[in-house]
Amino acid sequence: APVKQALLDAHIGKDVYGSYEDGILQPFFSIVAKNADENEKEKFLSIIRGTLKDIVKNGMDRKAIEAGINYFEFRFREADFSSFPKGLMYGIDVFDSWLYDENKPFAYLQQLAIYDELKKLAKEGYFENLIQTYLLDNTHASIVTLIPKTGLAAENDAKTAEKLQKYKESLSKEEI
């Protein structure tokens, strides 16, 4: 939340969110600022880095970390997958670990012990170290800017319709 709040306070984007994709061989973390000015890329990066450095230096809010861990532990114990069927979600979890290690198909289902471990590690600066190692010191990063073009879908539809019309005109009655 501190990175999101810093970006919003600086008016970088109208909506800011982060995500972590771990169900692949090379997991990645992303921070997205929707409706941001493309000319503020450097400011975007500077705010993120500055906020993360401050978190590492001053530590994270311990109560917020504990609340987050408790939230996910509760969801895990309750098997709360919102509107998704339990079996489907367990299957996806099994697949995520099995895909890259055929000897550990059930590794992601045996998560309960990790919550106590995370609570202990949080008191020892574990999350700050993760931020330093995997975000601040990581040289494998990129910034991607997507700029919408008004009317692009309609333009593509018109091109496709024209192409299909020309193709249809090239066919005989039997081929149609």
Regions found by a protein language model. Give the residues of each.
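Structured ligand/cofactor/substrate-binding pocket environments in proteins
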Residues: 1
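Core subunits and conserved enzymes of cellular information-processing
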Residues: 131-134, 176
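M16 family metallopeptidases and their MPP-like homologs
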Residues: 4-120, 139-149, 155-157
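N-terminal leader/propeptide and maturation segments of large enzyme subunits in energy/redox metabolism
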Residues: 151-156, 160-176
